Amino acid sequence: VLPYVPVIFAGVEGRTALPAADQLPQKTYLAYGSSITHGSLSLIQPDCYVFRNAQALGVDYLNLGFAGNALMEEEMANYLVSRRDWDFASVEMGINTAERVKEFPLEVFEERIDRFTAVLARDPRPVFATSFFGYLDEDTDRTDKMRRIVRRYAAERLIFTDGLQLLDDETLISADGTHPDARGQEQIAARWSRIMAETLANRTAR
């Protein structure tokens, strides 16, 4: 349920001890994205891919999932890199703009992705990026074009994994046709956390 309801600390009884410094996570992972990142339809928050990624990597996490409003604004990118409380990050790009692209040209979407990724790329910390996860789409031509735009900029500037590599199974998508179900969230986490672990280990070994 945490961190979405008020929690009142009433105290602790019995023999207890605060965790030692070496028992706490040494790094923090920040995740930006849509309601999928936020954890919608993952049953409970510890089932969302962000929590599972952090668990697999043994790190703390900051979930900046914005339901319906992950619009990749340049201002948001500047805010993310201004924060000094994370060591590596992930950005999920595209799904919240899929309908909006009907109202403005793809060139506007491309300019937004260009500026967003350019800001993130200037920060030395590792940023993992992905495009649309698999979902039941009525306009595959438009979505394919948007996927290619995300790939063009993110693959050059960030640590990119196509969303279809993380989730491309209709049986793991919920009844709304957009959000992964609990098993879908698990698959995203299993695949992406493995990529993250290998990439971060290689960077540490340099």
Positions of the model-derived regions?
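N-terminal secretory targeting modules
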Residues: V1-Y29, S193, A197-R206
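Catalytic nucleophile-elbow at a beta strand-turn-alpha helix junction centered on a G-D-S/GDSL motif
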Residues: K27-V50
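Conserved beta-strand scaffold positions in the cores of enzyme catalytic domains, especially
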Residues: A31, Y61-N63, F160
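Surface-exposed cleft-lining segments at the edges of enzyme active sites
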Residues: S35-S40, L62-G68, I95-E107
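Short, surface-exposed alpha-helical segments at coil->helix boundaries
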Residues: D47, F51, D144-R147
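Short helix-loop-beta junction
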Residues: V50-L62, R152
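Short connector loops at secondary-structure junctions
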Residues: V59-M72, L166-L167
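Alpha-helical cap/lid subdomain in secreted, periplasmic
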Residues: E74-R206
